Amino acid sequence: MDSFNYCVQCNPEENWLELEFRSENDEPIDGLLVTITNQSAPSNTYTQTTSSGKVLFGKIAAGEWRASVSQASLLTEVEKYASRKEGQESPVKKRAAAELDAADKDTKQYRFTTIGDFWDEAPKDEFLQKQHKGIDVNASAEKAGFRLSHNQTYVFEIKALRSYMPVIIDTDEFNLVNSYTFALLSKLAYATNDFNRDDGKTIDNQGAISTVISQLKRKERPTYSGDLQAKWLLEEIPYSKALSAQYYAEDDVGSEGYIIFNDELAIIGVRGTEPYFQSKKPPVDNTKFKIIKAASGMAAVIADKIESATDSPGMKDLIITDLDAAQIAPEEFGGTYVHRGFYQYTMALLSLMEKDLGLHKIKKFYCCGHSLGGAGALLISALIKDSYHPPVLRLYTYGMPRVGTRSFVERYQNILHYRHVNNHDLVPQIPTVWMNTDVSEGFHVLDVFKSRVDLMRKMLTDDDDDNYQHHGHLSQLLTYNSNNQVLLTPKQTQVTMLDLANLATNDSVAMVDGLSDASIVEHGMEQYIPNLFEQLTALSDESLMVHYQRAISALEQEIATLQQSYLTVKQAWIESIGNGTPTMNIGRLMSEMHSINKLIENRNKIRGELRQIVSDPQRMPATKFLISQQTLPDEIKVQIR
């Protein structure tokens, strides 16, 4: 029966039924295969496909009918339409109340529904069965469809079939939105599938991997990433593109990570160094620590149940992985040299992941990680590049140590990698360029006759010029006073991974003089994530030029204040000499002068770098800060605020 060739008003004695299917934003939903069934005579059915969101059935029997829609058309068509903005009044309900039915007599009947009110058979997807089950109070478990009466126009607003996913901008250019998103995803790698963190004690699960993925699928906003409360930037997607996750944990080495995926992309997150130095296993007894004599003849303090320390995630990371800086040349990386500890950690995780990686080989790959996790993410990216040659492979790391030598960096220079450093984070400074803990490299029998210092230096340093180097394009957050930072993107730092003839010698903008000035306090994701979010907030409303100029002005004021403080302390020091001031107090004044002078030097370095940047058009974009070459979209600005 063609609904457009039937006239209700032309046939007032005949019964009819009109149905409209609308999205939450009052858009007509076409392509739905709708069937109405007479409740008194179930063999009496009619079927039409929605056009302009409508079907009209004429010449039908009076009585109760039930409308159902093919499950396939529901799942295919409804997910195409976006959700209504939160708090907005339903435009469907408003319009239905103002319009007359097909007979031009009564107002239309409005109903808010879900796909579960109409599907002719329930999908196998248990999530859909639970989250989109029917809400019709007259629904029947035995019979599919929505209960209706003849001679009515029903307007059905169908709940959007949508999910969330973190905002990922599809670009090879640096953008701060991606930096923030993958910082959260790197933090998520510290969670387990079921708990906020992997310490064997935590029972909280707001930031567990399964919790976050389930919330995104339900189109709910997660409020945690791991054990850190955080604001996720999200975009709405069709339900068929909702993310799923697989968690991996290898017990012997302690490697952990995940693959989050849909039909288009795969995100690999690798856990960094665990900050937990107690075993996840329950203690067997209360045995105390005791002193024993080691085979080497050196005294050691250990516990009877030594596994309480060595079996902890943090100790495994520290001893088995982080401190093993020997350079090895595995065949997987074409004979180039990598850090042995990081290699072993990565291969242990890969032994679990590998069977699933092949399922995603034609998708876009994104890899991320913090600290040790960044090292693992880089090595996995290299293996993915060699094995699958994916169309897109992008890597985001935070506080990542050096992973491979020059030969490794040269081989994998085409992997797009944005490497983030917070202030003077210590971890990116290690292993030092010259380090190699393979004690046999370059070792000669006559070396045993050298001094202990020389022998130790030879055993712990590299013996050739294929030294540790950083991979990736540097972005650095720099604090210029107690409350403010500036972001140096790869365009501003210009610390390239490889500039053809010369490998960059700097691994971060030189605002500190050495490792003694670097800080482990600035290493945690609880530092990186808020700092990146503050940059997003600031740069969503002003240009990078204005942001830098404000920083320069603040630095000039702070330098002037520090210089005045220095002169005041210096005058006090001069007056203290020879007037009987205790030596300890004089020493304190000298120490204070030294500290102030170091602050002045640091602030001058940052100011000088910023002045160079703002005077160079090649390093300073003219627009407000960007996702690629565009300003932030309004929907992202709203979430940031």
Swiss-Prot record:
Any single GO CC term annotated in Swiss-Prot or TrEMBL for this entry: extracellular region
Biological processes per GO annotation: lipid metabolic process
Entry's localization field: Secreted
Knockout mutant characteristics: Deletion does not abolish killing activity. However, triple mutant lacking tseL, vasX, and vgrG3 fails to kill Escherichia coli.
Disulfide bridges in this chain: none
UniProt signal peptide: none
A Pfam match: Lipase_3
Role description: Toxin secreted by the type VI (T6SS) secretion system that acts on prokaryotic as well as eukaryotic target cells.
Protein name: Toxin TseL
Organism: Vibrio cholerae serotype O1 (strain ATCC 39315 / El Tor Inaba N16961)
